[in-house]
Amino acid sequence: MPHLFSKACQYFPGGVNSPVRACRSVDITPPVVTRASGDFFTDSQGKTYIDFCGSWGSLIHGHSHPYICEAIQQGLQRGCSYGLTSEQEISFAEEIFSYLEISNDHKIRFMSTGSEATMTAVRLARGVTERPIIIKFSGCYHGHSDVFLQEIHFQQTILDTVDLTQPLTLSLPFNNLSLFLDVMNQIGHRVAGVIFEPICANMGVVLPLPGFIEGIIQTCRKTGSLSIMDEVVTGFRVSKGGAAALHPLKPDILVFGKILGGGLPASAVCAPAAIMDYLAPVGKVFQAGTLSGNPLAMSAGKASIALCREKNFYTQLSAIEDDFLSPIEQMIQQSGIPVTLVRYGNLFSFFFSENRPNNLKEVQLCNTDIFRTFYQQAFLKGIYLSPSPFEASFLSTAHSMENLNYAQQVLIESLEQACSLV
């Protein structure tokens, strides 16, 4: 039977509607999913995979969680889309503000994608400050808006036309606080905003060095630039309050996505009203969207956050992470194979290097050929990690102990086999 992916290639560029799904960096034929439930999905060939991608971190409760599905079913009876302010939007906003303990002097705006939300955040920063320059950090991914497409791990795929935006976007090395401070001392008065991932997830998992995030926020306050924390990946995942709760200094603007929609398309920008009221129709900064605040996505998102409220939710996630990944870490340390496992808050990545990378240049020194072999070995045995050496993989509360034990053994064997070929 021909693989269904060949038919996908007839209709979609590269057979996909988002590039990394093509699995080219791991050199496998991408699975075409027919159904998914809990911690697994089934492809068009009838093979089942334990899923550690989870729709790129969107599914912290796993696939097809009954409570979220029920919320969507009930929402369908009320209508799929209104193009008007809805009760569901208001109810979901109340839930978010209550859950994250956001003060009443803040406001939120819903959109459909992370790219829309980050694009809106930087446009808002420019509108508020009336300054032109945006600073980002190399290796951090903030969506596919032109303003962000430089110094990312798939740089070679970007058209030269993007260079037109680069004089207004400056990309600096992640974790290099001294260079950031030097740059801000020179041009801080022209910087509208500084956008950053609090934990990088799109060059693999790269953690901030102590003081780096605080240094960004503190410097922005001194220069009048707006700090923008991109929590599309980390929001509602690494702790109850997301990554922002892990730092004493809070950013000016927060961006959410993925888990926010409970598996449906939803994102948001949240900031004090003094900033948010620059958005149209109150202010001069334009942003719009036909499906922004879609009622089905709002219903799914509210159900997703309600599940996060359950007692010991993050304690349970932490235990799953520890039970699954600690033995793999121990094997790596004892065997001396050239692999570094980086993990935080149920995100994890394997870097084929003896040292933990702290920035994009160090990530690019890792051996992607060995990663490819490792990935293929695990994939053949039914383990689906995020299919790139530059992407995080994710755990969820749906991962069963039985499947985790199996996956753990497969990953250990695949690591050993891949490294034996060096």
Curated annotation (Swiss-Prot):
Q: What CDD domains does this protein's entry cite? A: OAT_like (cd00610)
Q: Where in the cell is it found?
A: Cytoplasm
Work out whether the entry's keyword set contains Transport: no
Q: Which reaction does it catalyse?
A: (S)-4-amino-5-oxopentanoate = 5-aminolevulinate
Q: Kindly list the positions at which N6-(pyridoxal phosphate)lysine occurs in this protein.
A: 258
* Chief location category: cytoplasm
Entry similarity comment = Belongs to the class-III pyridoxal-phosphate-dependent aminotransferase family. HemL subfamily.
Subunit (UniProt): Homodimer.
What is the name attached to this protein's record? Answer: Glutamate-1-semialdehyde 2,1-aminomutase
Q: Which organism is it from?
A: Chlamydia muridarum (strain MoPn / Nigg)
Q: Which gene encodes it?
A: hemL
